[in-house]
């Protein structure tokens, strides 16, 4: 399973390869989870945000939300470079000028309006990202103190803190 530090590195690789470019989009796997992804084709990728194990690709008024789960992964290749996995196993391909990013597997790959990100049930329940530059330790400590009977193990597993 991809952990937060792995997602942060993926965000950096993906950002270096694609941010600021007009992106071609395809979903080669006919059973892929990329419903609505064609709406992103030709749009400029403004940025990518990592929040815990989630990646959010900012296309202006639309966001591509990716969660890799236990077995998913984003691969970055040079345009025309041979992929390590078959094309038909790709859920999504984001093609820039010189690079392309390919998502294989993962339980979540969806497009949502940017206006819904803050209220989306899957994303709104997430607590602060400890790897984010703006991480506020005081807020987490306050959350822990608000439930003094909770065990440390339960607190660490609670993503809303």
Role assignments for model-derived ranges:
Residues 1-63, 95, 148:
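Extended, highly charged segments
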Residues 64-161:
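Phosphate/anion-contacting hairpin/loop surfaces
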